[in-house]
A protein has these predicted regions:
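Bacterial Sec-exported substrate-binding components of ABC uptake systems
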Residues: 1-44, 154-183, 190-193, 210-222, ...
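A short, structured surface patch at a secondary-structure boundary
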Residues: 3, 7-96, 100-107
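Phosphate- and divalent-cation-binding pockets in alpha/beta enzyme and binding domains
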Residues: 45-46, 112, 335
């Protein structure tokens, strides 16, 4: 695999590596699978992308599914909701007689749900695409679904196109934006074009002798909102940090070399907000009123641009960003690039975004 670290795919064998203990789960495919239960909506997106949504016979949390085709099949009684790992419908799962149930684990501890399924004779295969750090690493799981369904060639060609698109966008941006400068975009810049910016300190000149020739600086991004009293900042090597970096930004407070998020207080986030040009993914909030209502301290966060990945949220609360977004990181990257360009120019671009909205 080019990007995926927790997956190996052969012609008739798929090996998934558990990141918690290094154990391997193997799925051998001697013929295309005809009936699949998906415990994650991202699995549905991969099957949808290769035109195999019809093999899905069961899902976990139908209300959270974004796929229009899958929802239509659910409404028609062709797909069933099998519950959650904490409250599964074992009788329904067994009755569906799936060729495989695609699951996931969130720790090294043995899952009573998965153990029970195995004892009932249900074939289970665990996947960890949600723990891949590289956006293309998550998208590369389409190859596994291609092998499952006999559409490996299609899956390979789709992934090649996705990776090519993503890498071209990232390279164009990287060619323009590379080195740190202290000038804050969106607050102090007065031109739509930043190509004439000069190094802002002697430090810039020493660290980057070519800074005189560099154009735009990286957009400084505040991420997320607190859950309870804890605010989680993505690690510098995490999925979201890679997307933001490839789009020309940097996440404030992200720890370099780390994939895991780190916890900070709201007060610490407020200090970071003073440097921020943009605020991304503020939870469920779709307006500044929502933000102010969620935490009175947010009224003091004077960040010029706020965007959330909630454009494609279902009535049941599912978010397509975490469904089809896994298959289409190049679309997310385009959204972020458009947002960062808008931050520089001060223009509104909400209508041209696919996964994001502007929080006003």
């Amino acid at each position: 695999m080019e990007y995926a670290a927790l997956l190996r795919v052969g012609e008739d064998e798929i090996i998934s590596v558990c990141p918690f203990d290094g154990t391997e789960d193997t799925l051998r495919v001697t013929e295309p699978l005809g009936k699949v239960i998906c415990m994650s909506t991202s699995h549905i997106a991969f099957l949808d992308a290769i035109g195999c949504d019809s093999v899905v016979c069961g899902v976990s949390g139908a209300a959270y599914v974004s796929s229009r085709m899958l929802r239509e099949r659910f409404d028609a009684g062709l797909v069933y909701d099998v519950g959650y790992d904490q409250a599964p419908d074992y009788e329904r799962i067994v009755a569906l007689q799936p060729d495989v149930l695609l699951a996931y684990r969130v720790s090294a501890a043995e899952s009573p749900f998965l153990a029970k399924l195995s004892s009932l004779g249900v074939r289970v295969f665990t996947l960890y695409e949600f723990l891949e750090d590289h956006p293309l690493g998550r998208a590369e799981y389409i190859k596994a679904f291609g092998t499952m369904t006999g559409r490996r060639s299609l899956a390979d060609s789709l992934f090649a196109a996705i990776a090519n698109d993503y890498n071209l966008i990232a390279k164009r941006i990287d060619d323009q934006i590379d080195y740190p400068q202290s000038k804050k975009i969106g607050v102090h810049a007065h031109s739509d074009s930043l190509s004439g910016l000069k190094p802002n300190s002697e430090y810039d000149r020493k660290v980057n002798p070519k800074a005189e020739n560099k154009g735009p600086v990286r957009i400084k991004v505040l991420m997320n909102i607190p859950y309870g009293d804890v605010w989680y900042v993505p690690g510098g090597e995490s999925y979201m940090a890679r997307l933001v970096r490839d789009a020309g930004g940097e996440i404030l407070g992200a720890k370099e070399g780390e994939s895991q998020s780190r916890a900070i207080t709201v007060e610490e986030a407020y200090v970071l907000s003073k440097e921020a040009d943009c605020w991304l993914n503020p939870g469920w909030c779709r307006s500044r009123r929502d933000l102010d209502a969620s935490n009175p301290m947010f009224k003091n966060f004077r960040i010029p641009a706020i965007y959330n990945n909630t454009r494609r949220v279902t009535s049941g609360g599912g978010n397509d960003f975490w469904e089809s977004g896994y298959v289409n990181p190049q679309v997310i990257l385009k959204d972020l690039r458009t947002i960062f360009d808008a931050v520089k120019s001060g223009k509104s671009v909400s209508d041209s975004l696919y996964y994001y909205i502007e929080v006003k």
